[in-house]
Amino acid sequence: MRKKSSTPNRGFRVADQIQRDLTELIARELKDPRVGMVTIQAVEVTPDYAHAKVFFSVLVGDPKACEEALNQAAGFLRNGLFKRLMTHTVPTLHFHFDRTTERAADMNALIAKAVSSRAKDD
């Protein structure tokens, strides 16, 4: 039987704090040229805080190269989180490129195309 947490939203708060700290660490301390302007979109932490999926988007540059660089720097970033977080364990970081913004732009283009073709028909 699973034990209920004494603080119900702790996982969300930890994920939010990891997101804020990673954003700062990547911007200020990570010197890899493959990592350009990165935005951390979301962080999902497992219930045991052993792993965290970090979803990011890139404004400029190659997403695959950036994902590879971030996954290679995961140990360095995790070490930085150890110094900032006041938790017993800091999760292992797994970076994934978030395609949500690309899909949203594609959907907006399709909607605009449908609206313009409908306006021509009227």
Swiss-Prot record:
Q: Which InterPro entries match?
A: KH_dom-like_a/b, RbfA, RbfA_dom_sf
Gene Ontology cellular-component terms listed: cytosol
From the Swiss-Prot or TrEMBL record, state where the protein is found.
Cytoplasm
- Family per similarity comment: Belongs to the RbfA family.
* The protein's assembly and partners: Monomer. Binds 30S ribosomal subunits, but not 50S ribosomal subunits or 70S ribosomes.
Q: Which Pfam families match?
A: RBFA
Per UniProt, the keywords (alphabetical) are: Cytoplasm, Ribosome biogenesis
Report the protein name in the record: Ribosome-binding factor A
BP GO terms, sorted: maturation of SSU-rRNA
Coiled-coil-forming residues are none
* UniProt cross-references to Gene3D superfamilies, sorted A to Z: 3.30.300.20
GO molecular function terms noted in the UniProt entry: ribosomal small subunit binding
Function of the molecule = One of several proteins that assist in the late maturation steps of the functional core of the 30S ribosomal subunit. Associates with free 30S ribosomal subunits (but not with 30S subunits that are part of 70S ribosomes or polysomes). Required for efficient processing of 16S rRNA. May interact with the 5'-terminal helix region of 16S rRNA.
Keyword check for Cytoplasm: yes
